Regions:
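Amphipathic alpha-helical binding modules
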Residues: 57-113
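Positively charged, low-complexity intrinsically disordered regions
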Residues: 17, 36-38, 89, 108
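Amphipathic alpha-helical coiled-coil segments
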Residues: 39-48, 65-70
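Short, solvent-exposed secondary-structure capping/transition elements
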Residues: 22, 43, 47-54
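Short, charged, amphipathic alpha-helical segments
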Residues: 27-32, 50-57
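Low-complexity, intrinsically disordered short peptide segments enriched in small/polar/basic residues
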Residues: 4, 53, 101-102
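Amphipathic, non-membrane alpha-helical rod segments
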Residues: 26-45
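Short terminal alpha-helical segments
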Residues: 1-26
Length: 113
């Protein structure tokens, strides 16, 4: 997948995140994985071109606006705190995601949502 495609997919995901956006834990985690790959590119020796960095920043702002912070990573996945996107969940969840998350309990034993 090219850098442009990776960023476009993250951008598309954050644009579609409307209240009640239908997604499953698996689909949501897959999208968060896109952001992780972008972060790996951002940490590389060659910075992202300015126009791509702006798209990522705009997408990140949309994602933050449509989500709420968690004290543990989304759905019990393992992630470093620097991967802030893993520590957020949609503010308004569709029924499939809500049901999926109700079944997931993080290692600390407290429900995520």
């Amino acid at each position: 997948m090219t850098v442009d495609e990776l960023i476009r997919r993250w951008d598309d995901f954050t644009t579609r995140m409307a209240p009640g956006f239908p997604t499953s834990v698996h689909d949501h985690a897959k999208a968060l994985g896109l952001r992780t790959r972008i972060a790996e590119l951002e940490a590389g020796a060659v910075p992202l071109p300015a126009h791509l960095a702006r798209r990522v920043a705009d997408s990140d702002a949309r994602f933050r606006h449509a989500t709420v912070e968690l004290s543990v990573p989304f759905a019990g996945y393992q992630a470093p705190r620097s991967a802030w996107w893993w520590f957020r969940r949609p503010a308004a969840m569709g029924p499939e995601l809500e049901a999926d998350l109700a079944r997931v309990v993080p290692r600390e034993g407290t429900p995520i949502a």
